[in-house]
Curated annotation (Swiss-Prot):
Gene: rnc
Catalytic residue list: 44, 116
Alphabetically ordered keywords of this record: Cytoplasm, Endonuclease, Hydrolase, Magnesium, Metal-binding, mRNA processing, Nuclease, RNA-binding, rRNA processing, rRNA-binding, tRNA processing
Subcellular locations according to the entry: Cytoplasm
Subunit structure, interactors included: Homodimer.
Chain sites annotated for binding Mg(2+): 40, 113, 116
GO molecular function: double-stranded RNA binding; metal ion binding; ribonuclease III activity; rRNA binding
NCBIfam families in the record: RNaseIII
GO cellular component entries: cytoplasm
Organism: Legionella pneumophila (strain Lens)
Residues covered by the RNase III domain: 5-127
This protein's record includes keyword rRNA processing: yes
UniProt keyword annotation of tRNA processing present: yes
Protein name: Ribonuclease 3
Substrates-to-products reaction catalysed: Endonucleolytic cleavage to 5'-phosphomonoester
Length: 224
């Protein structure tokens, strides 16, 4: 099947002077030695810088920790794959037969890596200004989202606010088990809410982490 790279360029709103950059950025390691692995390395750093710079300018009152959490939220693999799916990136990937058969064009990790590689390809082809422009275009709806700062709140806080807004009782966290050696303990926590049938569980290296994971699991259940 012939892949129409010009169509992808239109979706990216960027025309490559050297289409070889784009083709390499779309080539998985299973499809050849001239693949996107090195591009991915470069694209990861470019994306991180552009998003960090944008957040720094948009949120002058945020602390370093808050800016770091926002950046981590925006550049995580799941977010990259989500953006990749929005532009139909999976349809343009060059994959080996094994990856094709196993549905690699839908895999979150492959989509995320390929998107980072494309950002590197744009940088190599058109410079930092072009790369920044495309990154901010792809991220515009997320950067402008009034709920973006919700990711700064931990899971227990988000769950409590959700329950209060929905007129539910507050959650109860119960430590049900601690296992393992003293220097490598595993804590098990159960989260329940009076009047709610769902039960959520969290496991972590300390009680706080286990409670946070249980709260996250409960919130995901309640929000469907």
């Amino acid at each position: 099947m012939k892949i129409n790279l010009e169509r992808l360029c239109r979706r990216l709103n960027y025309h490559f002077n050297n289409m070889a950059y784009l083709k390499q950025a779309l080539t998985h390691c299973s499809a050849g030695s001239d693949n996107y692995e090195r591009f991915e390395f470069l694209g990861d750093s470019i994306l991180s810088f552009v998003i960090a710079n944008e957040l720094f300018n948009r949120f002058p009152l945020h602390s370093e920790g808050q800016l770091s959490r926002l950046r981590s939220f925006l550049v995580k693999g799941e977010m990259l794959a989500e953006i990749a799916r929005e532009i139909g990136l999976g349809d343009y990937l060059f994959l080996g037969q094994g990856e094709l058969r196993s549905g690699g064009f839908r895999r979150t990790s492959i989509l995320a890596d390929a998107l980072e590689a494309i950002l590197a390809a744009i940088y190599l082809d058109g410079g930092m200004t072009a790369a920044k422009q495309i990154i901010l275009m792809l991220y515009s709806s997320r950067l402008d989202d009034p709920d973006l700062n919700h990711c700064l709140k931990d899971a227990k806080t988000q769950l409590q606010e959700f329950l209060q807004a929905s007129k539910f009782a507050l959650p109860e966290y119960v430590l049900t088990k601690v296992e393992g050696d003293e220097h490598a303990q595993i804590f098990h926590v159960t989260c329940t809410i009076e009047g709610v049938s769902q039960v959520a569980y969290g496991t972590g290296p300390n009680r706080r982490k286990a409670e946070q994971l249980a709260a996250k699991a409960m919130l995901e259940q309640l929000q469907g």
